[in-house]
UniProtKB/Swiss-Prot annotation:
The species this protein was found in: Staphylococcus aureus (strain bovine RF122 / ET3-1)
Cofactor needs: thiamine diphosphate
Keyword annotations: Glycolysis, Oxidoreductase, Thiamine pyrophosphate
Name of the gene: odhA
Function: E1 component of the 2-oxoglutarate dehydrogenase (OGDH) complex which catalyzes the decarboxylation of 2-oxoglutarate, the first step in the conversion of 2-oxoglutarate to succinyl-CoA and CO(2).
Origin: domain of life: Bacteria
Lineage: Bacteria, Bacillati, Bacillota, Bacilli, Bacillales
Protein name: 2-oxoglutarate dehydrogenase E1 component
Length: 932
């Protein structure tokens, strides 16, 4: 590996933040070379003898003797670092800055005459051939750094990136738009503004979350997509909240005006869906508000055929960011091959649009940005655009953040930040150009802060002057960017005044024509909102059978390693035991081996697998060992990359210490590539609630709201084992509360073979109408439990079973105990010590959909049954009890007694003391097995 950070010898020329210090050290060196470190002695000796470092030093020795050069360089340094504080980036209501660093020539006891006597090369080496002297160069820098784009990049640690940005920003450049392009740009703005005005006039008070004040967002997106087309990027993934969303849908994804206006009129918009199939819009049966909806457009409008997707989004601001990143990575990965996927960052790019209040306020943004350079998550650079209207509902910046800009928090991720005046549309285009060039060069994120305002209230029913009267006095006086740019083109002679007004009127005419096509009487009235017939049934078992030899061949391959690969002896001993199910009569397949065999057969079927989570390569409980490490060299080997007849990729990554962003990423990946078996594994199930927004707003409701299918699988370690309230419960009750309309499968298993068949069933459902999320309350101590491990013949045939029982004599059973997961195993082991034929244990393997028919059939076979008990280790107000009670109550009816055994109602999930845990657990088991 190479270290991207440059040696200190490059610091004085390129490290703006350290320039003052380096100059002081250089002065010390001139007085006494031994007073500075040896590496700086070498550097300063080079400067002293080589004009290429500071080209003008020799010719300015007289000025340098009185500190002139040092003052010049400090002025330059300040302009680069702090010029943004005086930049012309505010269309209205510029902030009053306090304590602005020195940025003027006179602040450094300099003047025009002095600067004209100094070479331009002292300002920057690339200025030497452009400007006659330092004065001209500094004027250029002042104009550049204090203009309509404010640049922040001196915080970036990478020397090459910072140097590239400095040259790109300071080299004379202007967006060159010919007259036709300027006219086209004005038309874009006319459509953007005209659309909002039409809706405002014709649907008074209707919520639309207008784009007005940051209208330039649309041409910025159009410019971005056009550049991407030229670079061969054919998949664009966009994520944004509600502000300006309707405008982006109509003018970037080309959603017809008729469809949009239909939604305001509550008529059926799908009647106006383009018949050529170029626009894909899915809908759920309960639906969502119009400003949450997304779509996919296939178009050549931007220069080549591209697929442009705007992700569906809830009102939870910013939560869509990791979803978009995941969708992008899925579009970049080639998964239809053996081994690991190959990733091509030129296939797709993400654009994420943020709000200025939500960007620094929501932690999901920083979880997501942290993924940017990680092997398992990088998308080759995201374009972040902040639609900065400088207010959040009623909250002004002084109450919204502790930093100068909403973007300051992005500095920790070593990305450039450009603030641009939203009313200077040509400057916004230039900002996009530089951002896209940087992304292409370095495959890193860029943040553009589009500084504008909000024309109306948070929504169009809100009166902003109640809480923000002074800013809105000025906002109401501010002309729209459409008008500002139009007048500029009139003054330049690009268009006439009549043409400007004609463009504006044409937009209104087109909107009126679209409006007139809609039949007001054609109202949508479907109160039943039934789910699709495909979801009437639970996840179907995969009945494919395997020969003993087939599974043995797979197992042998998984336990074969490259010559010279040195596995830790302790681990090698554990792995060798995985041969036993195939060469010993009493050999059993434990949980981890069952998973490996399932994964291998799924890969042979052509379904790619992607598994991520904290410590997932090894497994939190040291059970999986999917990635092996050579104990001498540290090199890695992944056996699931070498499965015989493998037709798809296996991708596994240890995730960063994040839940929300990582789960959102995997959800997005699976939505984009529905053939991919995506699995997120929590370190402990207790930590899954950090992803609750993803669960609530995407995973469990996306199909109902948006018609968006997902088959994401969650592995959530869950069991009460005396480890305290934060390492016991995956909050099973919350997933069961979210379960409805066959929107998911929730299981808590007690058998390794059932786990094998479950994984295969889930994989088989992918990319079908039956696909749905799978939630596995995965084991901890049961990973190595011999009661859970099963012989190989349970793997060669059969399928997933929603309930499991042991053999029993029907007429002797008087009590049925229903339990799940580890509770079932604890009961089974206790009953084995004191057998009682009157008690029948039933493992409820699948909790949702609840196996009513299977239980009803079982109970009907027991003529002397008197009591049915539900036993769980969770408190009564948690776990599955409150969910299963209505089902079991119906099954029991008046025929049998119904009882509950488990912890009493508790605020916390579990006891903190391990010994107390044992007492409580044993008491539950003892009471449950009593036969009254």
């Amino acid at each position: 590996m190479t270290n991207e950070r440059k040696e200190v010898s490059e610091a004085p020329v390129n490290f703006g933040a350290n320039l003052g210090l380096m100059l002081d050290l250089y002065d010390d060196f001139l007085q006494d070379p031994s007073s500075v470190p040896e590496d700086l002695q070498v550097l300063f000796s080079t400067i002293k003898n080589d004009d290429s470092i500071v080209p003008s030093l020799k010719s300015t020795s007289s000025q340098n003797s009185d500190g002139t050069i040092k003052r010049v360089m400090r002025l330059i340094d300040n302009i680069r670092q702090y010029g943004h504080l005086k930049a012309d980036i505010y269309p209205v209501n510029p902030p009053k800055r306090k304590h602005v660093p020195k940025l003027e020539i006179e602040d450094f006891d300099l003047d025009q005459q002095t600067l004209e006597g100094i070479s331009a090369g002292i300002v920057s080496d690339h200025f030497a051939d452009i400007y006659d002297n330092a004065y001209e160069a500094i004027l250029r820098m002042e104009k550049r750094y204090k203009g309509p784009i404010a640049f922040e990049y001196t915080h970036i640690n990478n020397n090459t990136e910072r140097g590239w940005l400095k040259r790109r920003i300071e080299t004379p450049y202007k967006v060159t738009l010919n007259n036709n392009e300027k006219r086209a740009l004005f038309k874009q703005l006319a459509y953007v503004e005209g659309f909002e005005k039409y809706l405002h006039k014709n649907f008074v008070g209707a919520k639309r979350f207008s784009i007005e004040g940051v209208d330039a967002l649309v041409p910025m997106l159009q410019r971005t997509i056009t550049i991407a087309a030229k670079e061969g990027i054919k998949n664009i993934q966009i994520g944004m909240a509600h502000r300006g969303r309707l405008n982006v849908l109509t003018h970037v994804l080309e959603k017809p005006y008729e469809m949009m206006i239909s939604e305001f009129m509550h008529t059926d918009p799908m009647k106006f869906l383009p018949e050529d199939g170029s626009l894909q819009l899915t809908a759920g049966w309960t639906g969502d508000v119009k400003y949450h909806l997304g779509g996919i457009k296939t178009t050549d409008s931007y220069g080549t055929m591209q697929r442009i997707a705007l992700a569906n989004n809830p009102s939870h601001l910013e939560i869509v960011a990791p979803v978009v990143e995941g969708r992008t990575r899925a579009a970049q990965d080639d998964t239809q091959r053996a081994g690991a996927p190959t990733t091509d960052h030129h296939k797709a790019m993400p654009i994420i649009i943020h709000g200025d209040g939500a960007y620094p306020g929501q932690g999901i943004n920083f979880e997501t940005m942290n993924l940017g350079n990680l092997k398992g998550y990088s998308t080759g650079g995201s374009l972040h655009i902040i639609t900065n209207n400088r207010i959040g509902f009623t909250t002004e910046p002084i109450d919204a953040r502790s930093t100068t800009y909403s973007t300051d928090v992005a500095k920790g991720y070593d990305v450039p930040i450009f603030h641009v005046n939203a009313d200077d549309v040509e400057a916004t285009i230039e900002a996009i150009d530089i951002a896209m060039e940087f992304r292409k060069e370095f495959h890193k994120d860029v943040v553009i802060d589009l500084v504008g305002y909000r024309r109306f209230g948070h929504n169009e029913m809100d009166e902003p002057s109640i809480t923000n009267p002074v800013p809105y006095q000025n906002i109401r006086k501010n002309d729209s960017v459409e008008y500002v740019f139009g007048k500029k083109l009139v003054n330049e002679g690009v268009i006439s005044e009549d043409e400007m007004h004609s463009f504006i009127e044409q937009v209104q005419k087109e909107l009126r024509q679209a409006h007139d096509k809609i039949n007001k009487a054609d109202k949508m009235d479907n109160p039943d909102m039934e789910k699709p017939a495909e979801l009437a049934l639970p996840l179907q078992a995969d009945e494919q059978s395997f020969t003993f030899d087939h599974l043995k061949e797979i197992n042998d391959a998984l336990l074969t390693y490259p010559d010279g690969f040195n596995i830790l002896k302790k681990l090698n001993k554990v792995l060798k035991k995985r041969h036993e199910p195939f060469n010993k009569e009493d050999g059993l397949v434990d949980w981890a081996q069952a998973e490996q065999l399932a994964f291998a057969t799924i890969l042979q079927d052509g379904t790619p697998i992607r598994l991520t989570g904290q410590d997932s390569e090894r497994g939190t409980f040291s059970h999986r060992h999917a990635v092996l490490h050579d104990e001498q060299t540290g090199e890695t080997y992944t056996p699931l990359h070498h499965v015989p007849n493998q037709k798809a990729t296996f991708d596994i990554h240890n995730s960063p210490l994040s839940e929300a962003a990582v789960v959102g990423f995997e959800y997005g990946y699976n939505v984009e590539n529905k053939k991919s078996f995506n699995i997120w594994e929590a370190q402990y199930g207790d930590f899954a609630n950090m992803s609750q927004m993803i669960f609530d707003n995407f995973l469990f409701s996306s199909r109902s709201k948006w018609g968006e299918r997902s088959g994401l699988t969650l592995f959530l370690p869950h069991a009460y084992e005396g480890q305290g309230p934060e390492h016991s419960s995956a909050r099973l009750e919350r997933f069961l509360q979210l379960a409805a309309e066959n929107n998911c499968t929730v299981v808590n298993l007690s058998s390794s073979s059932n786990y094998f068949h479950l994984l295969r069933a889930q994989a088989a459902s992918l990319d079908s109408e039956q696909m749905r999320p799978l939630v596995v309350m995965s084991p901890k101590s049961l990973l190595r439990n011999k009661t859970v491990a099963k012989p190989i013949d349970e793997f060669t045939s059969g399928g997933f079973e929603p309930i499991l029982t042991e053999s029993y004599q029907a007429d002797k059973v008087t009590k049925v105990i229903l339990a799940t997961g580890k509770m079932f195993i604890d009961l089974k082991e206790a009953l084995a010590k004191n057998p009682d034929e009157s008690v029948l244990l039933v493992a409820i393997e699948r909790l949702y959909p609840f196996p009513e028919e299977e239980i009803e059939t079982l109970l009907a076979q027991l003529p002397n049954l008197e009591e049915v008990s539900w036993v769980q280790e969770e408190p009564k107000n948690q776990g599955a009890w409150l969910y299963v009670y209505p089902y079991v109550k119906v099954l029991v009816a008046d025929k049998y007694d119904l009882s509950y055994h488990g912890r009493i109602q508790r605020a916390a999930p579990a006891e903190g003391d391990g010994e107390i845990h044992k007492l409580v657990q044993n008491k539950i088991i003892e009471n449950a097995l009593k036969n009254n």
